[in-house]
Amino acid sequence: MRPRPVIGDPVRRRCGRAWVLLVLAGMLACGDPDRAIEARLTESERAIFMRGRSVAVPCWTCHDLAGTVDKVGPSLAGVFGRRSGTAPDQQGSEAMLAASIVWDERTLAAFLMDPSGFVPGNRMVSPGVGDPEMLRALLFYLRHVSQPGARDAEPD
């Protein structure tokens, strides 16, 4: 019977380093899906975009941008110009269908500030984005990443 390795022994340290390198290599290979978008932005726009990206992190719990992942909320791909409750492959709530809102900068801002107040009875559980600068950044980010193919385009 072999003795259990002690934390810090040379074998475990080598394996640990290899694991970290493997994870880092994988991350580098995948790249940043927003790189093509960022390349087209000015420096000040990039700052707003990155802030919006941070604000959007909780959104990805229920939503996606590809429309291929089965999530609780609708895909946000192509959300601008779409009517509420009509996302492809998603059964919209009765409240969203009845509201029949066309999503644009103004309607998304009002909804994201107070989801249950703007569309009573909808299923979104977010309390809303109360900070105007955070909301502005989130909308800027969504405007850019939700366009079909936006993340696929190569920078000029």
Question: Where do the language-model regions lie?
Answer:
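N-terminal secretory signal peptides that target proteins for export/translocation
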Residues: M1-R14
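C-terminal motif of bacterial Sec signal peptides marking the signal peptidase cleavage site
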Residues: G26-A29
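Electrostatic cytochrome c docking/interface patches
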Residues: G31-V55, D152-D156
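Gly/Gly-Pro-rich "capping" loops immediately C-terminal to redox-active cysteine motifs
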Residues: F49, A66-V102, S126
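The canonical Cys-X-X-Cys-His
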Residues: A56-A66, L138-L142
